[in-house]
């Protein structure tokens, strides 16, 4: 009984730690010029919660320690590749096909709570093909060579 009381007290107290409670979605500045609506839909479904400024924060994003993990993952995802800040250099855009092929993205721990992000083999291949067409074979380009960039319409 004593352990339960201390455990409950600890669970309540960690909610007071401020990290992970401020969930922001900065403005969308630009997206890539997607080769098709299907590519955009697949990337939205499987990638946008961590790799965009359009994160859908689930209810458990407000409960520590899950809030800490989610905040860390979204911050890391956005810093590595952000599909909604395409006006800035995205040095990891060239890695999309490799990460999806290896099964590293979307990560295994994301899928149980986000079943829509689970892609079939055909969908993975369509995402890879569409991303290669949309982002180019080199992935990210220098800002001066980003002719395929389009502003986001609201």
Task: Describe the predicted segments one by one.
Residues 3-154:
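Aromatic- and Gly/Pro-enriched helix-to-coil junctions and flexible linker segments
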């Amino acid at each position: 009984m004593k352990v339960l009381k201390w455990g409950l007290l600890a669970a309540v107290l960690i909610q007071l730690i401020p990290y992970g409670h401020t969930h922001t979605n900065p403005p969308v500045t630009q997206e890539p010029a997607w080769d098709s609506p299907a590519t955009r839909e697949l990337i939205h479904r499987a990638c946008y919660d961590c790799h965009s400024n359009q994160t859908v924060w689930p209810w458990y994003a407000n409960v520590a320690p899950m809030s800490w993990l989610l905040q860390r993952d979204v911050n890391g995802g956005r810093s590595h590749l952000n599909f909604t800040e395409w006006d800035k250099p995205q040095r990891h855009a060239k890695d999309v096909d490799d990460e999806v092929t290896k099964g590293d993205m979307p990560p295994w721990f994301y899928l149980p709570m986000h079943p829509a992000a689970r892609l079939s083999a055909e969908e993975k291949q369509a995402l890879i093909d569409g991303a290669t067409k949309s982002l180019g074979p080199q992935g990210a380009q220098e800002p001066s060579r980003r002719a395929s960039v389009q502003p986001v319409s609201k």
